[in-house]
Amino acid sequence: MVNTRPIAAIDIGTNSVHLLVARPIDGGPPEVLTTEKAPIRLGSGSHDMKRLDPDAMSRAVDALDRFRQIAEAHNAEIVAVATSAVREAEDRSSFLKRVRDEAQIDVGVISGVEEARLIHLGALGSVPAADRRHLVIDIGGGSTEIVVGEGTTAILARSLKVGHIRLTNRFFPGGRIESDQVRACRRFVKAFIAPVAREVRERGFDVAIGCSGTIENLALMAADRSGNPARTVDNLALTRGALSDLADDITSRLEPDDRVDIRCLDPHRVDVIVAGAILLRELCKAFDILELVVSAGALREGVVLDR
C-alpha cells in the first residue's frame, strides 16, 4: 500500500540545511520526489559552538521558507528536525522563533541518540545490511553518530560532540593547516573516540556503513583517484588504505586554495575536509574498519521511513 501523502523531511544541520520530499512506500524504499540543499554553516558562530552565526541564521530562514514552498507544492507533510548546532546553541530559542514566524515551520530539536536512531534507519534503507550485525558512522559538522545494529534495532547508539566544523574551528581556523595542528587534531580525536571504540569492538560488527556529506565526498575523491570514478555514492566502497592515502594528500595542502584542484572535492568543503579526513581515518583505525560501504541514506531518509 502506498501512503498517498509525501513527507517533506527537513534536516537543519551544523553545515547545511537539507530537504527531502519523498513518498513512503510499504515494504520498500521511499519514492524520492525532490531534494534541495543549502550550505548555511550555522555552527560557525563561535569557537565553542554555543552561539549560532547571525548571518547563517538569516540564510537558514530564507532557505527554510523556500523549502516550505516546495513542500506545499507537493502537498507534503513537513517534518523538520534540528541537530547539533541548534541543539547546543544558547540562542536556539530566538532562531526557532524566527523560523516559526518567518518561514512558518515548527522545528523539533532532537537529541543525539534520536539522531543516531533515525540515521540508522535511513542508512539501512540504502545499504541492505539488516541481516548482518552492522556499524553505521555519520560524520556531521558538529557531531558524529555511531550505531551498532542488528536488523533495524540499534544495540549501541552514541552521539559524539566531534565533527568536521567543530574540529576545524578548534584546530584549523580559516582552513589553514600547520603540521603541529594536524598532529594535535589526530591526538585529540584518538583520545576522544577511545571510549566508544571500546564499546564498538566489544559488540563487533560484520559490515561498516558510512553516510552523510563528509564520508560521501571522501569516497568520491578516493574512487576518482583509483581510476574508477563513481556516478553515485550508494554502496560505494572506501578502503582504509585509499582513505589513508587521500588523507595524507589533503593534509599536505596547507592553504585552502591548495585544495581547490582536488578532483571531486565539494568546493563548499575546501576548508573543513581536512578535519573530516582526519576524523574518519581515526575512526576507521579505532574501530578496525578495513572497508566502509557508503549509504546515500541518512537522517532525512530515516525521518521519512519513521513516519
List PLM regions with ranges.
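Helical "lid/coupling" subdomains associated with nucleotide-phosphate turnover
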Residues: 2-7, 21, 45-74, 83-133, ...
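N-terminal basic/disordered segments at the start of proteins
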Residues: 3-31
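Short aromatic-hydrophobic micro-motifs that form the base-stacking/packing surface
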Residues: 8-10, 79, 135-137
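Short flexible coil/turn linkers enriched for glycine and charged/polar residues
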Residues: 13-15, 77, 93, 140-142, ...
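A generic, well-ordered mixed alpha/beta core segment in the N-terminal half of proteins
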Residues: 135-143, 147
